[in-house]
Amino acid sequence: MQIQQMLENRIEELEMKIAFQEQLLDELNHALVQQQFDIDKMQVQLRYMANKLKDFQSSNIASQSEETPPPHY
């Protein structure tokens, strides 16, 4: 095989590797964007649930120390 042909084959292999890496990079970027979207959504939900819990705790429910013990005590 001539040196010219070997070089052309090597260049072709490198071009294919670059194409696959570009595709993989695009897929990973898409996955990262989706994960960040999911994280942002979960943070909003967590804040909402934390506020609901605060509201629940500060409602008219007596704390455990204020509750009268059950009759079997």
Swiss-Prot record:
Gene3D superfamilies the record matches: 1.20.5.300
Q: Which Pfam families is this protein grouped with? A: SlyX
The highest taxon in the source lineage is Bacteria
HAMAP family attached to this UniProt entry: SlyX
Q: Which PANTHER family match?
A: PROTEIN SLYX (PTHR36508:SF1)
- Recorded family membership: Belongs to the SlyX family.
Put simply, this protein is called Protein SlyX homolog
Q: What is the source species?
A: Haemophilus influenzae (strain ATCC 51907 / DSM 11121 / KW20 / Rd)
